[in-house]
């Protein structure tokens, strides 16, 4: 297994699909990386030479991925909560942020039902 950005990339998959195993890289960005490194999208990882894998590593290093991206997202959410803006309050209360209804539905965000005490 090739190791890119601290993640073991599956050998049996095509390059575009295998790169999506890295947090922060989706299909579109994986295609852009393949185009920038001039590696065929349908080539499997096990078929690539070590030099090609090194060029993939260098190209992925240009993006914010994995731990850095997770940290940035959590810091953005924390910033909203500290500001006390509407989105921050909704995050703090674990409610939907973008105007969805909460009288019914929103169970995923709110968690399991709490029993009514009498």
UniProtKB/Swiss-Prot annotation:
Cross-referenced Gene3D superfamilies: 1.10.8.50, 30s ribosomal protein s13, domain 2 (4.10.910.10)
Protein name: Small ribosomal subunit protein uS13
UniProt entry tagged with the keyword Ribosomal protein: yes
Subunit annotation: Part of the 30S ribosomal subunit. Forms a loose heterodimer with protein S19. Forms two bridges to the 50S subunit in the 70S ribosome.
Cellular component, GO, one term: small ribosomal subunit
Domain of life from the UniProt record: Bacteria
Family the entry assigns: Belongs to the universal ribosomal protein uS13 family.
InterPro entries in UniProt: Rbsml_uS13_C, Ribosomal_uS13, Ribosomal_uS13-like_H2TH, Ribosomal_uS13_bac-type, Ribosomal_uS13_CS
Classification via PANTHER family: 30S RIBOSOMAL PROTEIN S13/40S RIBOSOMAL PROTEIN S18, SMALL RIBOSOMAL SUBUNIT PROTEIN US13M
An annotated GO BP: translation
Function (record text): Located at the top of the head of the 30S subunit, it contacts several helices of the 16S rRNA. In the 70S ribosome it contacts the 23S rRNA (bridge B1a) and protein L5 of the 50S subunit (bridge B1b), connecting the 2 subunits; these bridges are implicated in subunit movement. Contacts the tRNAs in the A and P-sites.
Bilayer-crossing regions: none
Disordered: annotated span: 94-118
UniProt keyword RNA-binding, yes or no: yes
Protein keywords: Ribonucleoprotein, Ribosomal protein, RNA-binding, rRNA-binding, tRNA-binding
Pfam families linked: Ribosomal_S13
Gene Ontology molecular function, alphabetical: rRNA binding; structural constituent of ribosome; tRNA binding
């Amino acid at each position: 297994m090739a190791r890119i950005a601290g993640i073991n990339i599956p050998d049996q998959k095509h390059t575009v699909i295998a790169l999506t195993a890295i947090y922060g890289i989706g299909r579109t960005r994986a295609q852009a990386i393949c185009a920038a490194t001039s590696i065929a999208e349908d080539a499997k990882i096990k078929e690539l030479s070590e030099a090609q894998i090194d060029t993939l590593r260098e190209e992925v290093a240009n993006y914010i991925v994995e731990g850095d991206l997770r940290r940035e997202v959590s810091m953005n959410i924390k910033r909203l909560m500290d500001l006390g803006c509407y989105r921050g309050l909704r995050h703090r209360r674990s409610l939907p942020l973008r105007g969805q209804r909460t009288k019914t539905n929103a169970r995923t965000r709110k968690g399991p039902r709490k029993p009514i005490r009498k």
